Amino acid sequence: MASSVMQNPRREVSSPSRKTSSKPSLDLRRQTHALLSIRPPFAEAIFRGEKRFEFRRAIFRKEVETVVVYITSPISMVVGEFDVKSVISDDVVSLWERTRSKAGIDSDGFFKYFAGREVGYAIAIGGVRRYVKPLELEAHYGVRPPQSFLYL
């Protein structure tokens, strides 16, 4: 299967930056934000700059520029966001070869996650911003935690 990279044509993202922000950059007039549920160790690795790809079995249909990060239990809070540099779609073996150096997961975990799938997706992470104060998802956004993602 041929691989593809979906570039974000609206914004060029330079080197990753780690900033702290008191409020999210959410602009509801533009449907360019998605909320992702991410397990605590993977979310922490993203904010430390160790994990540069977020893997998904299903991907957005709309263009997404910013991912709002909801850390799952036991934290259960929105803690920050990151810019989407691109989305890579490829067969699972090729996807691992292309992303493994900054995957933030070992090969066993990667292939277990994609078991039974031919194609996988990797969201290339650009600049990251951790909020000064985590936000309660339902109180702040009026939604419940998504199984995978939802558009904001």
Kindly label every feature range from the protein language model.
Residues A2-L152:
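Structured alpha/beta reader/binder surfaces that contact nucleic acids or chromatin modification marks
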